[in-house]
Amino acid sequence: IEQIIGSTTDFASVIASCNGVDAVIHVAARPNIWSGTGEQILKDNVIGAWNVLQAAEEAKVKRVVLCSSDSVIGFTVMSGNLKRPEYLPIDTSHVLRPTDPYALSKQISETMGRSFFERGNIEIIALRPVFVLYEEMYGEVKARAKDPSNYKGPAVGGPSAAGGGPLWHYVDPRDVASAFRCALEVPVLPKFECLFISASTTLAPNPTIERMSAFSNQEYEIRRPEIYINNPFAPLYDLSETEKVIGFTPKYDLRHLLY
């Protein structure tokens, strides 16, 4: 496989990578709110996404799959900036309220994706993964589950503290790879879409609705109560739209790590 080493902020490197290919998956970015200053995150992520989209269009690439984030909703891990959802489960019609530089960079990237799609020269879709839980984080997840109130992490040698926000959302990297493959292989994308990618459960010790109500001290409008009746630990996000559009359903449930 040919490899081209460069930066997405360097258009020459990006166009060289796009020439002669049918599709592009754009994942390269500063990956979270801790990966740089606000200026650095916005500069690298926004310019990088623009260069990928512009280069793909010029190279006549047929499809681009953008990696966005569930943080565009405003459910951020930045202290003091979390926006509570207006209803549950959160679907693709939910208002976007990014409150940190990373989330804002992803919303801008989605908007650019829609703009390029509307030009009519290329198919574009954006996927919004939650916290990607790699195997080297399993020890941290177990440590947090044993003592949720006092866990600070990293406690047992993991690369960072266990993530996923207040609901302990996660998705297995194998499911992430599968979702991106589904987005590449679905025959037609008739419109621009932004789809949530998550496991079918959270890693929180208590059911989702109970935890959300206690966390925010309020009740929520539950638009699809059957989701939480059938699966009390279902994520905040409606995954049915993802299945409908690209045929993806998560396979890996890691709640066994809690016991």
At which residue positions do the language-model features occur?
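NAD(P)H-binding glycine-rich loop region in Rossmannoid oxidoreductase-like domains
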Residues: I1, I5-D44
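Glycine-rich NAD(P)-binding loop of the Rossmann-fold in SDR/ketoreductase-type enzymes
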Residues: T9, A23, Q40-G48, A59, ...
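Glycine-rich "substrate-gating" loop/helix at the edge of Rossmann-like oxidoreductase active sites
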Residues: T99-Y102, V130-N150, P154-A155, P159-R174
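Glycine/proline-rich active-site loop of Rossmann-fold NAD(P)-dependent oxidoreductases
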Residues: R119-E123, Y134-P148, A161, A183-C194
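Catalytic helix-loop patch of NAD(P)-dependent Rossmann-fold dehydrogenases
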Residues: K43, M78-I124
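Mid/C-terminal beta-alpha module of Rossmann-like enzyme folds, strongest
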Residues: A177-L239, K244
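Conserved Rossmann-fold NAD(P)-dependent oxidoreductase catalytic core, especially the SDR/UDP-sugar
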Residues: N51-T99
